[in-house]
From Swiss-Prot:
Full protein name: Isoaspartyl peptidase/L-asparaginase 1
EC nos: 3.4.19.5
Record's keyword terms, sorted: Autocatalytic cleavage, Hydrolase, Phosphoprotein, Protease
One Gene Ontology cellular component: plasma membrane
Native organism: Arabidopsis thaliana
GO biological process, one term: proteolysis
Leading EC class: hydrolase
Pfam family name, one: Asparaginase_2
Length: 315
């Protein structure tokens, strides 16, 4: 075994290269903080499942990412959050969607995995399950910020479902690349080759109430097995159609591709250009973070000393 490794993301999309410093720096700082948190946890011997949950919780608590506190609004001005988590060794997994009051959806997804015979709970039943297990909840107004109200207003004015960090067009007001559609995720592997993946999001601005994206769909936005762990981000419908996360693992399992080869093939060939990015680690400590969008907020580190925090290609 090569050793531990970790990778995380804060969303992929059309992130303009001239993203203002006041939008860029807080996100880069958050990625650095979360990466350091994950590294410390892995070095202290925490299982990858704990590490992935810990990092995603921290990302959910950061208002500049579209998950937890920063979740964007539906067409009706409400929040509907979703998340999933998976353990590679056992293939146990949990997923939730339609959450309106849960502070950390990723932790509720883990409770579904550990406390029920099921994989997926949604909407009122998931909220009731959260209350029954003492999960931290708040009034839904906690998530409805002035910034997200403004984003929804803009999306409605132009009759669109707002996609990831959309580059403004001449008919669309300049949003500084801050459409706040960044799914968050983390994958981790320890020195024994144990793997885990976790992903969380608020979805699209102006999405239909009840819409479910790729994030809570095991095999689409999240997957882990004995070979690798993957967390995807981007346009959910395309990621679901491409079964992105599972396809990376399948190419490794059935075709013998390396993690980097498998992930690159899926991102380049299985989904439309401009629709997807992912972070992934393998059981031997390999890390890859490909994307076919303008940029992806991402960070990684491995036991051999390599680390990276980046947004655009080659930066």
């Amino acid at each position: 075994m090569v050793g531990w490794a970790i990778a995380l993301h804060g969303g992929a999309g059309d992130i303009p290269i001239d993203l203002p410093d006041e939008r860029r720096i807080p996100r880069e700082s958050a990625l650095r903080h979360c990466l350091d948190l994950g590294i410390s946890a892995l070095k202290s011997g925490k299982p990858p499942l704990d590490v992935a949950e810990l990092v995603v919780r921290e990302l959910e608590n950061h208002p500049d990412f579209n998950a937890g506190k920063g979740s964007v609004l539906t067409a009706q001005g409400t929040v509907e959050m979703e998340a999933s988590i998976m353990d590679g060794k056992t293939k146990r997994c949990g997923a939730v969607s339609g959450l309106t009051t849960v502070v950390n959806p990723i932790s509720l997804a883990r409770l579904v995995m550990e406390k029920t015979p099921h994989i997926y709970l949604a909407f009122d039943a998931a909220e009731a399950f959260a209350r029954a297990h003492g999960v931290e909840t708040v009034d839904s107004s906690h998530f409805i910020t002035p910034e997200n109200i403004a984003r929804l207003k803009q999306a409605k004015e132009f009759n669109r479902v707002q996609l990831d960090y959309t580059v403004p067009s001449p008919k669309v007001p300049d949003n500084c690349g801050d459409s706040q559609i960044g799914t968050v995720g983390c994958v981790a592997v320890d020195s024994a080759g144990n793997l885990a993946s976790a992903t969380s999001t608020g979805g699209y601005v102006n999405k239909m109430v009840g819409r479910i994206g790729d994030t809570p769909v095991i095999g689409a936005g999240t997957y882990a097995n004995h070979l690798c762990a993957i967390s995807a981000t981007g346009k959910g419908e395309d990621i679901i159609r491409g079964t992105v996360a599972r396809d990376v693992a399948a190419l490794m399992e059935y075709k013998g591709l390396s993690l980097t080869e498998a992930a690159a093939y899926v991102v380049d060939q299985s989904v439309p250009r401009g629709s997807c990015g992912l972070v992934a680690v393998s059981a031997n400590g390999e890390v890859t973070m490909p994307f076919n969008t303008t940029g992806m907020f991402r960070a990684c580190a491995s036991e051999d000393g390599y680390s990276e925090i980046a947004i655009w290609p080659n930066n």
